[in-house]
Amino acid sequence: MEHPLEIYNTLHRKKERFEPIHKPHVGLYVCGPTVYGDAHLGHARPAITFDLLYRYLRHLGYQVRYVRNITDVGHLEHDADEGEDKIAKKARLEQLEPMEVVQYYLTRYRHAMEALNVLPPSIEPMASGHIIEQIELVKQILKAGYAYESCGSVYFDVEKYNQDHRYGVLSGRNIEEMINNTRRLDGQDEKRNGVDFALWKAAQPEHIMRWPSPWGMGFPGWHCECTAMGRKYLGEEFDIHGGGMDLVFPHHECEIAQAVASQGHPIVRYWMHNNMITINGQKMGKSLGNFITLEEFFSGAHPSLNKAYSPMTIRFFILGAHYRGTVDFSNEALEAAEKGLERLLDAAALLDGLKTADTTSVEVGDLRKRCYDAMNDDLNSPMVIAALFDAARAINAVHNGQGTITSSNLEELRTTFRLFLFDLLGMRDERASSAGGSEAFGKAMDLLLSIRAEAKARKDWATSDKIRDELTALGFTIKDTKDGAEWKLN
């Protein structure tokens, strides 16, 4: 490859060459879901984005430890320091234990990720399983002088921290403006400044989720878990931290401050953020009530959907846009993605049957380079897909007798097409598996068509037509060619 991998670092607002701290090892941390409801399209985007990164880093030969956390405590409503824990509220409404809620939705989240062909992370730590580490983090920040205790809670002193470091380095926010605005809005409470954020919150006896600490019974602030767990599993400095763009502030800004305050230096080298999924121009999310769950996409059971969309259609739809660009939901866009993916899968299915010649009229020499150049340019998946569409046209041309290809060029085409479509973009052909098995299903179809061919040879048109008509009624397209019959599932 002529060009090394470059990724956009939100911290410096530019693309930078990726250079691991401890090559060939790479530490990757991605913020996972707060599990109090079914996963929706907005959850699918970061999962698929960083699955693409994970796959590509491994393909490049790196040994990747991928940590994606599960938030099951401390995430209050509206991402605030006051209010009710999202999971505790769900548990109260449904008259369940909080961990019942967590287990139910976490299981459903994992099933959805499996359907989307998202590889499981190396480690999937849960916030509630790392209370000791979070308490230790808070103690370190207190000892360094960047936090204070108030009414049994502990808050990060943003103004004090900003005197020695810079709060706002990731988001670009101005600390003076933030302090002035929060003073006008919040008035006086437990905090010295409204911009200060909770490291540990005191909990009343009726609070369902609470733990003992040096400051009394309580629970950790939302921002603590990622700093504590990232450091535990990836060390005091690791390569990449990813998440949705909506986490830049306050979550990731607070993570940076916590790390610097507790250990004297930043913990992350590259910050990567995917953009939002929008619906009618607004961010799709639970807080706005405008979300469509992944299960609803898969089943079509939502009034905004014209039909059901397969998991691979959803994955292809998301990868059809660059991860830093917005993606606006529409049925038209999903249907276009569905048709585009089908074209590529059809082309992939033709690869094994293409006949070679001594000469080639199809140019495939730069296909691999185009795909690698696109991936190395900040994971430019739309450009990879564009190159694959060009390759699909070449495959179809050879298949239709409008071009020729040598055996060496065909092997290059097969290897590159399958590497980028299946191994890296993570697509899989659901059509055969959804009909009850892939290889066995294909062999059964070939057997049926061979019986039909024998019937035609005997001029048994009734049997031949019956097989064709019955298969058509079941949703298959049967096409007779000079080399025999071909089939596909519509």
UniProtKB/Swiss-Prot annotation:
Pfam families noted in UniProt: CysS_C, DALR_2, tRNA-synt_1e
GO cellular component term of the entry, any: cytosol
Keyword Nucleotide-binding listed: yes
Motif ('KMSKS' region): 283-287
EC annotation from Swiss-Prot or TrEMBL: 6.1.1.16
Motif 'HIGH' region boundaries: 33-43
The reaction(s) this protein catalyses: tRNA(Cys) + L-cysteine + ATP = L-cysteinyl-tRNA(Cys) + AMP + diphosphate
Subcellular location: Cytoplasm
Cofactor binding note: Binds 1 zinc ion per subunit.
HAMAP family according to UniProt: Cys_tRNA_synth
SUBUNIT field: Monomer.
Family named by the database record: Belongs to the class-I aminoacyl-tRNA synthetase family.
Protein name per UniProt: Cysteine--tRNA ligase
Organism: Porphyromonas gingivalis (strain ATCC BAA-308 / W83)
Source species taxonomy: Bacteria, Pseudomonadati, Bacteroidota, Bacteroidia, Bacteroidales
